[in-house]
Amino acid sequence: MTRIKRGYIARRRRTKMRLFASSFRGAHSRLTRTITQQKIRALFSAHRDRDKQKINFRRLWIARINAVIRKRGVSYSYSKLIHDLYKRQLLLNRKILAQIAISNRNCLYMISNEIIKETERKEYTGII
């Protein structure tokens, strides 16, 4: 009986998986079954953390803006700033405000002071 050699498709699939897992440690980069499990786990984590990254960056921007705003005025906070921005229809998103807060605090102070003056003037005249 002559020997029949296997096809190349399964080997090609396994080498592709091994290339994906080449940076993993221990058996996770050597054994085929654990490579497939770790690949599934890695892709699942990557998909989950792409959404989580957006949430974390938004949280970071809010914390930065709030820290700078609270240094300026005791009674003024992030939520009041965002509310006043929407009332005045200024299109500054949180990312831009956080960049301004880090790079140039005086500019953010000027923006917040203008908004505070505008709201106080409207409240004084009775227009809201």
UniProtKB/Swiss-Prot annotation:
Protein's UniProt keywords contain Plastid: yes
Subcellular location(s) of the protein: Plastid
PROSITE patterns assigned to the protein according to its UniProt record, in alphabetical order: RIBOSOMAL_L20
InterPro entries: Ribosomal_bL20, RIBOSOMAL_L20_CS, Ribosomal_protein_bL20_C
S-S bridge residues: none
One MF term in the entry's GO annotations: structural constituent of ribosome
A GO CC term assigned to this protein in UniProt: ribosome
GO biological process: translation
Keyword annotations from UniProtKB, A to Z: Plastid, Ribonucleoprotein, Ribosomal protein, RNA-binding, rRNA-binding
Pfam families recorded: Ribosomal_L20
Ribosomal protein listed as a keyword: yes
Source organism superkingdom: Eukaryota
PANTHER family: 39S RIBOSOMAL PROTEIN L20
Family note: Belongs to the bacterial ribosomal protein bL20 family.
Cited function: Binds directly to 23S ribosomal RNA and is necessary for the in vitro assembly process of the 50S ribosomal subunit. It is not involved in the protein synthesizing functions of that subunit.
Identification of the protein by name: Large ribosomal subunit protein bL20c
Native source species: Lathraea clandestina (Purple toothwort)
Gene: rpl20
